[in-house]
C-alpha cells in the first residue's frame, strides 16, 4: 500500500494520527500546511472543505482531521466554543476559560473529531467523540504530543487525570480511546 498524506499545521495532531495508523500497518506522511477554515460551526463541513483544499495543493489523495470542543454548560452559550476552538482563543487562554467556568458545577464537555479522506472523487468521513469534564485548574506537564492546551484541563470520563497528566500508554489505553 502506498503511503497516505496527512495535512495539518499541528504536529501534535500528526503524531497522534501516525501512531494510530502505524498500529494498523499504514505509513503516514506529514505535510505541514495551514488551510483556510470556513466560518461555520460544523466540524463535518470544515473537515471536508479542508480536504478539498489539501487535495488541490498536493494533487493526490489526502486526509485531514478537525476537532471541536464543546462545553455543555458554558455560561450563556451552551456548546461553546464548538468548531471555533482556535478562533475563540479558548485553547490559547485556558486560564481565562477556567475563570469563566469557576462557578459552573456541571463541567461536562467533549471533543468531537472528524477525519476526512479525499481521493479527488469521493469523501470518506469518520467521527470520534471523547467525553469528559473540565478540571478546576491547569494540570499536567508540557507534552509535544499535545494537540491543544485543552489537554491541561480535560479529564476524560472514567479517568482522574487530565490528558496532560497521563503517560502515552495511559492516554492510548483509556476506555474512550478504543
Predicted regions and their residues:
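Anionic-ligand binding patches
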Residues: 2-5, 12-178
Amino acid at each position: 500500500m502506498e503511503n497516505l498524506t496527512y495535512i495539518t499545521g499541528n504536529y501534535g495532531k500528526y503524531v497522534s494520527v501516525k501512531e494510530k495508523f502505524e498500529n494498523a500497518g499504514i505509513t503516514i506522511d506529514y505535510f505541514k500546511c495551514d488551510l483556510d477554515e470556513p466560518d461555520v460551526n460544523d466540524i463535518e463541513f470544515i473537515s471536508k472543505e479542508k480536504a478539498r483544499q489539501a487535495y488541490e495543493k498536493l494533487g493526490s489523495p489526502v486526509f485531514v482531521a478537525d476537532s471541536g470542543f464543546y462545553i455543555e454548560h458554558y455560561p450563556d452559550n451552551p456548546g461553546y466554543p464548538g468548531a471555533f476552538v482556535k478562533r475563540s482563543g479558548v485553547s490559547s487562554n485556558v486560564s481565562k476559560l477556567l475563570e469563566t467556568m469557576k462557578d459552573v458545577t456541571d463541567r461536562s464537555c467533549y471533543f468531537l473529531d472528524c477525519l476526512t479522506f479525499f481521493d479527488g472523487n469521493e469523501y470518506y468521513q469518520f467521527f470520534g467523540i471523547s467525553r469528559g469534564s473540565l478540571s478546576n485548574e491547569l494540570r499536567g506537564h508540557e507534552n509535544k504530543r499535545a494537540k491543544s492546551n485543552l489537554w491541561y484541563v480535560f479529564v476524560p470520563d472514567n479517568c482522574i487525570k487530565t490528558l496532560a497528566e497521563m503517560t502515552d500508554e495511559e492516554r492510548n489505553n483509556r476506555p474512550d480511546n478504543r
